[in-house]
């Protein structure tokens, strides 16, 4: 915020800061002595590739160890939804090319119980991640879902129908979260 730091007390309830004071009058049922420490809001990591890691590491280490409380997944245009049944291995392979995680680990680490982006977000929440997860829908998944293997050909141009279908998938994904 650009504000000066303050030395003081704060009280929190249910994950929210509810009161700040500097006169020692902020009482609480539990006291954490943070003398000579810095208390900050959680940090947002706006560029991660934790889309698959949440499947086998719902604490999303080491992000949580660095004060990260919210991560943005779906960067570099690669996501795991939307996906048509049977195309999951291709999305895992595409992610393997971006992130140094084997497609086999991705395939076994995620439940793959979805087709749409909202289903992916629901599946992630069922894993009970320790951090807030927000996402982008990746163009690679959208194009592959609509165009199949043609999406991988750099010279392939989507047809007018494919462009309409791509736009529909993006609208559906945005509406889903």
Can you say where each PLM-predicted feature lies in the sequence?
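Histidine-rich, glycine-flanked metal-binding segment
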Residues: 1-42
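Short capping/connector residues at structural and topological boundaries
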Residues: 10-11, 44, 55, 147
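Divalent metal-coordination and catalytic microenvironments
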Residues: 15, 36, 47, 67, ...
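Activation segment
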Residues: 21, 52-54, 72
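Short Asp/Glu-rich motifs
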Residues: 29-30, 51, 82-83
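Di-metal (Zn2+ and/or Mg2+/Mn2+) metal-binding site signature of metallo-dependent hydrolases
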Residues: 38-62
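Divalent-metal coordination cores built from histidine and acidic residues
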Residues: 56-173
């Amino acid at each position: 915020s650009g504000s000066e730091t303050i030395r003081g007390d704060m009280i929190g309830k249910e994950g929210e800061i509810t009161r700040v004071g500097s006169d020692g009058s902020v009482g609480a049922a539990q006291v954490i002595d943070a003398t000579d420490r810095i208390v900050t809001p959680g940090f947002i990591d706006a560029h991660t590739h934790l889309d698959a890691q949440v499947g086998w590491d719902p604490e999303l280490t080491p992000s949580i160890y660095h004060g990260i409380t919210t991560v943005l997944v779906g960067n570099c245009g690669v996501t795991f939804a939307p996906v048509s049944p049977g195309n999951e291995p291709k999305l895992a392979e595409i992610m393997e090319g971006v992130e140094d995680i084997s497609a086999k680990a991705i395939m076994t680490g995620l439940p793959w119980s979805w087709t749409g982006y909202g289903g992916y977000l629901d599946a992630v929440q069922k894993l009970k991640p320790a951090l807030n997860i927000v996402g982008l829908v990746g163009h690679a998944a959208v194009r592959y879902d609509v165009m199949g293997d043609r999406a991988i050909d750099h010279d392939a141009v989507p047809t007018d129908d494919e462009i309409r279908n791509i736009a529909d998938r993006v609208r559906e994904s945005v509406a889903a979260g």
